[in-house]
Each structure stands twice: as C-alpha cells, then as structure tokens.
Amino acid sequence: MLRWTITFLVIALIAAVLGFGGIAGAAAGIAKIIFFIFLILLVISLVSGALRGKKP
C-alpha cells in the first residue's frame, strides 16, 4: 500500500506542476485535492507500518 501511495503522490505532484504551469489550469484544483489525499494516505501508511513493527 505504501508503494501505491507514493506512486499516486508523485502523479499528483506532476499534475500540480502541469496545472500551475498554465498547461492545464482546470487541473490545478484537482491536483491539490489529490495531493493532500495521498499525503494523508502516506502518513497513515507510515504510522500503521510503524505500529506493526515493519520497516517501510
């Protein structure tokens, strides 16, 4: 799950760069939402992995 979270976080960052660069102005709002969703999922994955005792 951590790999998927990081993958989608990178995709959200790329979408944000493209959206804020003026290439796709409408994608900026969506990129912000996706970025924060997957940032939260990343934190949850790290915390749950730490509680289980597994290394990320």
UniProtKB/Swiss-Prot annotation:
Pfam family, one: DUF1328
Entry's localization field: Cell membrane
Disulfide bonds: none
GO cellular component: plasma membrane
Topology class, membrane: Multi-pass membrane protein
Keywords: Cell membrane, Membrane, Transmembrane, Transmembrane helix
Spans through the membrane: 6-26, 27-47
Family: Belongs to the UPF0391 family.
Protein name as catalogued: UPF0391 membrane protein PSHAa0537
Native source organism of the sequence: Pseudoalteromonas translucida (strain TAC 125)
